[in-house]
Swiss-Prot record:
It is found in: Cytoplasm. The gene is mnmG. It comes from the Bacteria. The lineage of its organism: Bacteria, Pseudomonadati, Pseudomonadota, Betaproteobacteria, Neisseriales. HAMAP family: MnmG_GidA. GO terms for molecular function: flavin adenine dinucleotide binding. PANTHER family: GLUCOSE INHIBITED DIVISION PROTEIN A (PTHR11806), PROTEIN MTO1 HOMOLOG, MITOCHONDRIAL (PTHR11806:SF0). This is tRNA uridine 5-carboxymethylaminomethyl modification enzyme MnmG. NAD(+) binds at residues 276-290. GO terms for cellular component: cytosol. One of its GO terms (biological process) is tRNA wobble uridine modification.
Amino acid sequence: MTHMIYPKTYDVIVVGGGHAGTEAALAAARMGAQTLLLTHNIETLGQMSCNPSIGGIGKGHLVRELDALGGAMALATDKSGIQFRRLNASKGAAVRATRAQADRILYKASIREMLENQENLDLFQQAVEDVTLEGERISGVITAMGVEFKARAVVLTAGTFLSGKIHIGLENYEGGRAGDPAAKSLGGRLRELKLPQGRLKTGTPPRIDGRTIDFSQLTEQPGDTPVPVMSVRGNAEMHPRQVSCWITHTNTQTHDIIRSGFDRSPMFTGKIEGVGPRYCPSIEDKINRFADKDSHQIFLEPEGLTTHEYYPNGISTSLPFDIQIALVRSMKGLENAHILRPGYAIEYDYFDPRNLKASLETKTIEGLFFAGQINGTTGYEEAAAQGLLAGANAVQYVRGQDPLLLRREQAYLGVLVDDLITKGLNEPYRMFTSRAEYRLQLREDNADMRLTEDGYKIGLVGEAQWRMFNEKREAVEREIQRLKTTWYTPQKLAEDEQIRVFGQKLSREANLHDLLRRPNLDYAALMTLEGAMPSENLSAEVIEQVEIQVKYQGYIDRQNEEIDSRRDIETLKLPDGIDYGRVKGLSAEVQQKLNQHKPETVGQASRISGVTPAAVALLMVHLKRGFKDAK
């Protein structure tokens, strides 16, 4: 093979053009770093490899956090979303989430446009087969045709491509996804570097030709009106034409067909060694695990406005193709369905995320960052969020500046990273709101309030977004202050007016702020009082923020007290090379776990399985004694 060194040296190289890679490259370039994005195929940049949707419970929170940090996913979704819904709209603010069906072609085009118009970013089409090192530090990568690209930091976002193997029934072949080759050489090279790794599995359902679906037998599921918006930089005018999803169900016949294929299932015959996602199981896994259920709901999701292709959400499978045809046609409305693409499972290498720092830099190779499914996560949103963080921290590393580290009480991205690096995983990791201890702090509506300032400080957030954020923050502060200084007395309001708005008579003088805290009174009703309306025209986002801050103030204050009480533990750093054998009272088991995981802070140590509260207390005593001795 010929070998040449590319004449330009980069600050950051990103390997992979999926959701993690595109966010990583855009983040690094936005911060002013000379960045190269390497992908095996420029035509597949930003491709939605599985389901045509963005967001949902927990995932939508990550998308908003990405957006608050200047990321691309939310804005691309506004430009490509063909159905938007607000989930849990009637529930508490902490679990409300936005979900969108996206037109695959429009989404990919939007991401491609952002990449091609981003300053400081070069694209190059070549598969990466090797990484180069100078001692224990990354120095670049080598592509399939022997071109060596030099860089001071590298972000690997290889998705399911590392030694990927595709399964349909008992047949299997190497591949990164259907139609794309696996990254076999790179996977082998990373194993040579003794990075701890394992095998995981994911899957996708067969795709159906919409012209062969009988929609008259299905239940229609339209989007919300008014149509929600994902990005603070987006608006409803960006949205393309809106369309419906459709609902059908499996039945006992479907389940019998699926069971008849178990003897040819790669999952049940041992052909697949990797562990699949618990919360997005294949249909055969569902039928096996929930044998008492006679039916499962299946959502038929349109793949776009210019295609007849539908994605049947809920029947991911690696069963033989004859079984796939039969199970699809056993469902109402799909009796004559034509399958355009078969479903399949894919096994791939991942690397133990406990070998990562909170910055997503590997502990063993300086300047090498991992993001996305290579870390064992599943989902576009989880990958994109990690990509942005890894890209930003690659730049911070190159500049010799402190990394962007997000705390558990600050962001779902902070929860995600902390879970990965302290607990590891034995199945693909998916984000849920239940994973966060401080859900009330981590709402979709306040993602910008939590993160935009940090993003702006390091160059992730541009001036236009920063200006919009400050206008919103100041409007919220002004309105809350106005509510506190606008008073009503029982004598000021007619008795029937009091009963109409409050449901009862006022017993004493009260300001609008205190009245809004009442559980049966919302902002809109309160503003019907004479003289209550603000003089400025407030956006729906400002009003929502005001209402939530006022109504949940007591709960938020209590959570803040809890967070403050743990701050010492969370932020106290553990010295590099600390000898846990010198910590008096630590058991051999705890010493072993701490030496294995190498946590960076006491907070991280406290979340390692087997590290008890008593062990954490001993660590704190040891560190404080060390600080005193140093003085």
